Amino acid sequence: MLWKTALIFLCWGLTSGELQNGLSATPAAPARRTLDFGFVPSGVYDTVAYYEPGAIGILFNMMHAFLFVVQPNPFPEDLVISAAKDKFGAIQSEYQKVIYYELGFVVCAALGLLFTVLLPLVGLLFCLCRCCDNCGGEMHQRQRKNADCLRGLLTTLLLTTTFIITAGVLCAYAANQNLSSQLKGMRRLVKSNLKDLHTFANQTPAQIDYLISRYGTVKEQVLHDLENVGVILGGRIHEELGKEVKPALDATLSMTGTMRDTKDALENVSLTLETLQEGTVKLQANLSVVRNSLRNALNDPVCVDAPAPEICRNIRNSIPKLEIAANYSSLPDVTDQLNKVNDVLKTDLSQIVAKGIASFNDTPAMVTAQTRNIVEGVKVLLDDIGNNITSFSKMLPVHSSLANFTRMISHTHSQIEDIYPQIDQMDFYRWIGCITLCCMIVLILTFNFLGLLCGILGFDRHASPTTRGCVSNTGGNFLMAGVGFSFLFSWVLMGVITALFLAGGNLEKLVCEPFQTRQLFKVLDTPYLVNSAWRNFIPGYLYNDPEMDLTAYSLYSNCKDNRGIYSALHLDRIFNISSFFNTSVYSKDVSRKFEGLKVDLRGIILLESEGKVNLNNFSETGINEIDFAAYLEEVNKGVTRIDLIDFANQLDAQADQLSKGTLQTSLKGHANTIRQIHIQQVVPLEQSMSTLNQSIRLLERTSSDLPLRVEDVLKAVDDAQNLISYNATFVINQETEKYKQNIIGYFKQYIDWIRTSLALEVATCKPLSNIVDTVEILGCGFLLDSMNTFWFGLGCCTLFLLPSIILSVKLAKFYRRMDTEDVYDE
């Protein structure tokens, strides 16, 4: 049922894949935004598939170290694969490799079997030997000088051996108890794993529903772009066409400024020319009066006496310079040109250009109006896609399949709960058996400790062997009892230990360690191992497609990383559901809808004929016929031939050289008069000349290329108009394609998000890897490590029973009461 559920996810993934193919890559419109689909709701898995043994881990490490010494060879991957392929026939043909790998186990097992077989025989022979008063059976002890030293050495060695055996039995007991306690923890692990499977099954429908519901985000954004098609598509068309239209309109608009500037300049020329003509006449008259008055003043008799004659002569020679320099009366007026410009300005070109700009700026509205039917068609298509997705989701038995899967989990849980009592009962029997084995050792240890205790406490060094006390004798008997039980139990213990060692050691080396190093997965993933016709057994079993690149290790690793079962099981390779949800059809449908888009911009008039006539009239106003050279020549002459202020200052200086009198006073009066003329008449005329100069130069610049400028403006406007009216198809198609791809891009984002979600977030298969890890924890961590540590501790005890037997027999001689002793005559 689980794989059926997984196949459902595949359907959604392939659906998204085919739509993505239809959304081919074209330059995306800048208006596209990244959609936010939110976060897929996810459950929380409780299982923590990690085992930390705690303090007993030290014993586990000792056991592992012992197994490494016994079996240091690497995992025989090739041998295992050959054995599996040949149904263990390879073992017969390659027995040498098997023996080489198992050599450590074989040697240890052989020693164990030898121990098991020989020890009862040795014990029997030992008993018979002692019955014949041999092998220490004679109740006679020879007196030796080093008896005390030997007794102390034997006591120390036996005590050390006994402590070692005690440590071993404690190790075995701890392992036995750990196994029972961990089996109780097994229930928690199993329960959490089954709970995670419930979470997996319960959250999956909600996740799928969430993926489906996020189509609303796509639809909402697409509707937004469709409803704003004028702003988006029309704006882009407007922007692209504006690269040629705006410069043309700006140039036309700048001509209106040129017209106004030309009018202002002509008016300035006309006014300043009239002002200059009138002003120079008045100035000429005033200067003539000053000249005549100065000549009359110089007729004064003072000019006869030295040094006045020289001064008067200089003044008289400079008087002719008091006259105007420019003759503005000869300059032609610009009335005709001004009148023509005024006639041109009667037509408001700026208003005409504004109408053209407004018409061009109406492009978004025109696009909105002309694409209304197409937009409505795409909206209907959106609804159809949504209906198809909804109907397709209803076709899939997601809820029913997952409900069956949930019931299967519940049934499995119930069955597991039913066998818990049997497991507990079996564990109890196992525990009893292990405790019995430990008790055998404990019984021997008890006799050893009691024997040592009674022997040490009851020993009297002054007593002869035949007169030893009851306590000392009892200690010796305890030691011999321990020897007897050692012979009785040790071969049984060694037999059990050997069997457990062979089974547990090989399982540890051939299963648990390879699982930790992931070599076991390499074996499982060996091509044609499980089935000679299947390259990979998982896809061969699930999908009957053994060539699919799906291995046990890849499945485990993906689930370990908590990826979705969709990607872990490579479900995108199973079904072709084009007949259900062929997304490329949708992209073609969207493209087909936009193929009928025809945006006609011929209604846009950038510059009406009246405006063109107006521009032509402006170029024919005749400002280029003005005699700019004559104007500039007169302007450059200045107002007067000589600077009146300088002349007045010189006149004052010359008057100061004369003696005081009427002539000096008259000359100074004339100097002041000249200054007044300069201030009141020359300065205003100079300002008018400056204005005239600026205006003439402006008109000269304007007229120099006016016809060419007008021609360029009209050509630019005509070119822009032709682009809009006849050649805008390329721009419209280009921007329409971008807009269309923008719309399709939202679907692509949705599909990419679905793919990513299916791969990483939907139906994450962590519970599957947790189950594998849990089996490893239960089998290797809980069961095998504990059992291996049990035989390791018990084996240590059993081995040290041999020195314990020897030492106990020898030490018992020093504690038991003898029947005879050596007697020496004095």
Swiss-Prot record:
One of its GO terms (molecular function) is cholesterol binding. It is found in: Apical cell membrane; Cell projection, Microvillus membrane; Endoplasmic reticulum; Endoplasmic reticulum-Golgi intermediate compartment. It holds the Pfam family Prominin. It is a multi-pass membrane protein. Keywords: Cell membrane, Cell projection, Endoplasmic reticulum, Glycoprotein, Membrane, Transmembrane, Transmembrane helix. InterPro entries: Prominin (IPR008795). GO terms for cellular component: apical plasma membrane; cell surface; cilium; endoplasmic reticulum; endoplasmic reticulum-Golgi intermediate compartment; microvillus; microvillus membrane; plasma membrane. Glycans are attached at residues 178, 268, 286, 327, 388, 404, 576, 582, 617, 693. The chain crosses the membrane at residues 50-70, 106-126, 153-173, 439-459, 483-503. May play a role in cell differentiation, proliferation and apoptosis. Binds cholesterol in cholesterol-containing plasma membrane microdomains and may play a role in the organization of the apical plasma membrane in epithelial cells. Involved in regulation of MAPK and Akt signaling pathways. Belongs to the prominin family. This is Prominin-1-A. It comes from Danio rerio. The gene is prom1a.
